[in-house]
Amino acid sequence: MRLSQYFLPLLKENPKEAEIISHRLMLRAGMIRQQTSGIYSWLPLGKKVLDKICKIIREEQERAGAIEILMPTIQSADLWRESDRYDDYGLEMLRIKDRQKRDLLYGPTNEEMVTDIFRSYIRSYKDLPLNLYHIQWKFRDEIRPRFGVMRSREFLMKDAYSFDLDYEGSKISYNRMFVAYLRTFSCLGLKAIPMRADTGPIGGKLSHEFIILAETGESAIFCDKHFLELTVPDSSIDFSDKAILANIVKQWTSFYAATEEMHDEEEWAKISDNNRLSARGIEVGHIFHFGTKYSAPMGAKVMGQDGKEHLVSMGSYGIGPSRLVAAVIEASHDENGIIWPKSIAPFDFGIINMKPDDEKCTHACETLYKGLRYAGFDPLLDDRNERPGSKFATMDLIGLPTQIIVGPKSVAQNEVEIKDRKTGIKKSLTVENVLNQFSVI
């Protein structure tokens, strides 16, 4: 894409309404625009990042055996009355009526609807286990939406729901999603720490929040530093091997980790001072087993091998892609702007033409631009008639991983400058060497 032809509405000043760095940078980088309180339009740069995050989430969900569906945003109130949640959910749920005066709602979550889909088609234990997921916009009427897309009223959410014959089967599905989440966050360039979460009235131990460390995080967290040394399974992991999955979950839950709400001072005191880590963190995912909470009132049953009907045991697994965009920025930025991990950067390269009216500079830029596109990359060419300083500031602000700087002096020596956005390290290469180096990545 040529920046002269792209829609990138940058802001020079920090917006006064933005309280945290991710909100400021997303507005300044032209990623989002607030339409009303807690509701945002996603502009081209932000949409590209959001799509890349969703792509990684899909890949890891399907690697773990989840199957994608798409459920509507508008739901019937009757389903929620079946589960007894319609009146209990509170003012966060947006309730509406159609022209026939039927009660509807803008879905804040999808347990009832996915349970209805399941009970409509699945009859036998032979069809289990089953894990259905979707990525859809949701709405919760927050009292005080703030922090941009970190806590908005409308947000994009990936929900997966597992269905098993019994609790033992649910544990296997839970472990599968636990490992899938570790891999998902790793692919996004994040180090996520699973922390025991409150299971509420259902009880049990199958509930974890995944927290990333960030200085501006909303939660205080306490964990053993050994977490920082653990290795996330690579793509060769066999999700059908129950023993391997159980061992990975055991490894990642054997050290102390808790948010402030679940913190246990007695357990914390057992950890040596050298291994204690107190920090701030951001929740980026939550997995939860809720048993028959929905299958019982909604009659989601299957015929077991024993010839009897069994209520299915369910689990829920959530990741918010729109929230993740902000979380990544909170964890990866500097005073000049965003620093995107390569896996979700909106463009792979930023090519800076320091002097567009110089024939040699323009020729070198065109050669790089076309060569990188031919190699399968998505470069952004800044071909605007702007000052070099303005172009450098733009590239730093939007955070592309690699900058290729093309100026008259370097081109005269048949070279261009490569700058790593994260480290700031620069090196000079010929145009041919640049194309040779990156065409094999």
Swiss-Prot record:
It is found in: Cytoplasm. It catalyses: tRNA(Pro) + L-proline + ATP = L-prolyl-tRNA(Pro) + AMP + diphosphate. Its EC number is 6.1.1.15. One of its GO terms (molecular function) is ATP binding. Its main location: cytoplasm. One of its GO terms (biological process) is prolyl-tRNA aminoacylation. One of its GO terms (cellular component) is cytosol. InterPro entries: aa-tRNA-synt_IIb, aa-tRNA-synth_II, aa-tRNA-synth_II/BPL/LPL, Anticodon-bd, Anticodon-bd_dom_sf, Pro-tRNA-ligase_IIa, Pro-tRNA-synth_IIa_bac-type, Pro-tRNA_synthetase. Keywords: Aminoacyl-tRNA synthetase, ATP-binding, Cytoplasm, Ligase, Nucleotide-binding, Protein biosynthesis. Coiled coil: none annotated. Belongs to the class-II aminoacyl-tRNA synthetase family. ProS type 2 subfamily. Catalyzes the attachment of proline to tRNA(Pro) in a two-step reaction: proline is first activated by ATP to form Pro-AMP and then transferred to the acceptor end of tRNA(Pro). Homodimer. This is Proline--tRNA ligase. It comes from Bartonella henselae (strain ATCC 49882 / DSM 28221 / CCUG 30454 / Houston 1).
